[in-house]
A protein has these predicted regions:
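N-terminal membrane-targeting hydrophobic helices
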Residues: 2-264, 268-284
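Extracytosolic and intramembrane catalytic regions of membrane-associated proteins
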Residues: 276-279, 286-426
Length: 426
């Protein structure tokens, strides 16, 4: 196994549910829309909780095998079925909690849970922006403690706290829309979302937006924070909240336009270069919607390519062998069947320097945009050969490209997104 680092978290943020920040913001805005006028900022807090609950399926790693957990993530908890049933269950639970005579204590626990969620967001941003630094999270913990010392004790134990004016139906509506919008946003990413579970394991992956895109999240977050400063009956509160929803939704629609533009560019390049192919898959690179990765299924091999909207040169394709001849029982092995399903068939195999087999989900591409070696693949898995009659053992590989740093990766990403100029190829 390889040491986990900031660059792995950067590359595999989808698997680790690092998109929670966007889902928290979206959930909070939805909660405000449903109940904000009646219960104020508590609607945002509970909306953020609703936006986080589906991703709690990551806890499956503690009681499932790695292979089963891979299939479980974005499964039943991300389904339309869960949105309906879960809304009634959590709505009933929230109503029951606030009807309890211990509602003040419950409110305190809820606030603590919200602080933990926000702390997770701070920790996420710290890992991305200043990996290895502990000061931001320490400052956050200090501010939470200061707030509790000055306001929390008096409010929750001084008799000034009141239960929110919401019934079971209103709570169920908040959770339903929080769950549903979470699922829909995930459908726009690459990983795949089983929205029809448990009736079907079909995965929806439109691949129009990166799992972490600040252009979607940051304006949304700013509008939400401004809205939270106004009283619940102030019209400006709703205005700012809807501004955030409108901006984020408009950007999401723009990513669909970008997707169609890049898809057309790839088709034209394949036709112009007289390349026969069966299908291709495109997806934006991390943190932006300008630089896109593409993988083409050309039959016996894959073709990798990157395209930036600022490129002045044609798309260049790099062939990568499928390597399926390295595997045995390709059509019957249950481990390989799960990986083919997970990757939508965009799977290749390589042999590592230590002799171990490695299979890669080609939809996520490589760090370099080509395929310089086994460690260059972003989404990769190690296989253990247990004998000719036994299924392959499975273990998700960890680590990033050797001798690299998150800062170097980001610089390379920014430079490539700026495009390849025609003069550079002359």
């Amino acid at each position: 196994m390889f040491p986990q680092s900031a660059k792995e978290r950067l590359a595999q943020s989808d698997l680790c549910a690092m998109d929670s920040l966007s889902q928290i913001v979206l959930g909070a805005a939805v909660g405000e829309t449903v109940l904000g006028r009646r219960i104020g900022n508590r609607a945002m807090i509970w909306g953020a909780v609703a936006g986080t609950i589906p991703d709690m399926d990551v806890l499956g790693r503690y009681f499932l095998s790695e292979l089963d957990n891979l299939a479980f993530h974005r499964g039943i908890s991300h389904s339309l079925f869960f949105s309906v049933v879960g809304a009634f269950v959590f709505g009933w639970a929230a109503d029951l909690l606030y009807r309890s005579r211990h509602h003040a204590l419950i409110a305190m626990v809820t606030k603590a849970a919200a602080a933990v969620v926000v702390g997770f967001v701070v920790n996420f941003l710290t890992m991305i922006l200043v990996p290895g630094k502990w000061l931001p999270i320490a400052v956050y913990i200090s501010l939470v403690g200061l707030w509790w010392w000055r306001h929390g004790q008096r409010r929750y134990f001084g008799g000034t706290w009141e239960a929110p004016d919401a019934g079971r139906r209103e709570w169920a509506a908040l959770f339903f829309w929080g769950f549903l919008t979470h699922i829909l946003l995930d459908c726009f990413t690459t990983y795949g979302t089983q929205i029809f579970a448990p009736f079907s394991n079909m995965r929806i992956a439109w691949g129009t937006i990166s799992v972490a895109d600040p252009m979607y999240t940051v304006p949304f977050l700013v509008c939400l924070l401004v809205a939270a400063r106004f009283a619940r009956t102030d019209r400006r509160r709703a205005l700012w909240n809807w501004a955030g929803i409108g901006l984020s939704s408009a950007y999401l629609l723009l990513t669909v336009v970008h997707f169609n533009r890049v898809s057309h560019t790839f088709k034209e390049a394949l036709i112009t270069q007289d390349i026969a192919y069966e299908r291709f898959f495109i997806t934006p690179t991390i943190f932006n919607n300008i630089l896109w990765n593409g993988v083409v299924d050309a039959g016996d091999a894959y073709l990798l390519a990157q395209h930036s909207f600022y490129d002045e040169v044609p798309v260049t394709f790099t062939p990568v062998p499928k390597g399926l001849d390295l595997l045995r029982n390709v059509d019957t092995d249950p481990t390989l069947a799960t990986l083919r399903w997970f990757s939508d068939g965009f799977l290749n195999a390589v042999r590592r320097n230590d002799g171990q087999l490695q299979v890669n989900d080609m939809r996520f591409g490589t760090f370099s945009g080509e395929a310089t070696g086994p460690d260059d693949y972003i989404f990769r898995f190690n296989l253990t050969d247990n004998g000719p009659d036994a299924p392959y053992g499975f273990q998700q590989a960890q680590g990033g490209p050797p001798d690299d740093t998150a800062e170097t990766m980001m610089r390379s990403l920014v430079k490539r997104a700026q495009g390849i100029k025609a003069s550079a190829t002359e």
